């Protein structure tokens, strides 16, 4: 996090944006080559050939709070295996892998290739966001995900996502020598719930879930987060989980970071609010939607419990999945859908 904060301050616009894939995005980069050098030096760019396809979501609280299984060890194992498979460099940049610990929080992102725990060491194979009916032992998970992704590379003819390929999941399973099953399909969740606030871990320590207005983490706040020197998890809800804290330390973290903009209140309207980049960052936008949304929240016109996405045009970039109220700017003002 120290390296990211320094890069944002020295080479970007002074902040970072958290994305719905748990990634970190820089804007207004003055020297892309220097940025790449810094991130590589910090170990954040381990592969020049596979960087665009290392999109792996995992249940953020896995192994610490709730869940059916602990998927933490599967994350680096899958990442290393993807990078070691030359053919997977040809996956589209929109490809998404997911490792769900059974609570259904990341499978709702409709990954191309994923698993969801159905027991402590048993998983459902998920393709294009749907349960195939195939069940795997934990020892099979990484190999089967690699096989399914490799099959997509060989089958695709320009499709960005497996869901865009005609009969994609069935064809992938056929190439893997597996058959889909209609038995015991997992329920389909509508949306994940961001972990916000004080979260007691199974070992008695504390995780703190902190949201950020508009998913924006400024460099100064990032430096303070890094100084905590505890494991950090970037979630697909544009928030951060600070893990493995003793109670006293957790209380001090809240006292310091809350006034700096980290949101630990699960009732904050910012939990449900998102926006595209808007004007002046996007030429297609009809309004400065981020400022307008910030003003609306400050005025108390937006309440917790209704998900809203503010967009500067009909493209609605950055819109989250699920049931969302769209507030869309046009030439004559905003429309609500």
Description of each model-found segment:
Residues 1-126, 131, 135-139, 143, ...:
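Small-residue-enriched alpha-helical segments and adjacent helix-cap loops
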Residues 176-234:
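Extended macromolecule-engaging scaffold surfaces
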Residues 116-193, 223, 337:
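An acidic, glycine-/histidine-flanked metal-binding catalytic module
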């Amino acid at each position: 996090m120290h390296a990211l904060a320094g890069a944002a301050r020295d080479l970007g616009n002074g902040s970072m944006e958290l994305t719905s894939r748990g990634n970190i995005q820089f804007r207004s980069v003055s020297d892309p080559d220097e940025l790449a050098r810094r991130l590589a030096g910090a170990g954040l760019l381990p592969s020049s050939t596979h960087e665009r396809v290392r999109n792996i979501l995992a249940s953020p609280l896995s192994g610490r709070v709730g869940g059916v299984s602990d998927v933490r060890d599967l994350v680096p194992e899958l990442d290393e295996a993807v990078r070691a498979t030359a053919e997977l460099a040809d996956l589209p940049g929109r490809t998404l892998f997911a490792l769900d610990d059974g609570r259904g929080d990341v499978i709702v992102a409709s990954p191309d290739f994923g698993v969801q725990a159905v027991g402590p060491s048993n998983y459902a194979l998920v393709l294009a966001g749907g349960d195939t009916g195939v069940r795997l032992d934990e020892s099979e998970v990484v190999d089967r995900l690699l096989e399914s992704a490799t099959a997509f590379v060989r089958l695709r003819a320009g499709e960005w996502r497996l869901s865009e390929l005609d009969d994609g999941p069935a064809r992938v399973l056929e190439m893997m020598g597996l058959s889909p099953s209609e038995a015991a399909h997992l329920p389909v969740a509508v949306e994940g719930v961001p972990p916000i606030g004080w979260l007691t871990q199974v070992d008695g320590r504390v995780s703190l879930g902190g949201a950020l207005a508009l998913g924006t983490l400024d460099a100064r706040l990032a430096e303070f987060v890094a100084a905590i020197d505890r494991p950090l998890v970037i979630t697909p809800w544009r928030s951060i989980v600070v893990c493995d804290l003793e109670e006293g330390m957790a209380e001090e973290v809240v006292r310091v970071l809350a006034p700096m903009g980290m949101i630990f209140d699960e009732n904050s309207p910012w939990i449900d609010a998102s926006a595209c980049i808007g004007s002046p960052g996007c030429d297609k936008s009809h309004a400065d939607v981020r400022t307008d949304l910030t003003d609306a929240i400050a005025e108390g016109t937006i309440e917790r419990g209704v998900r809203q996405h503010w967009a500067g045009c009909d493209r609605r970039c950055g819109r989250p999945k699920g049931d969302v109220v769209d507030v869309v700017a046009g030439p004559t003002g905003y429309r609500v859908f």
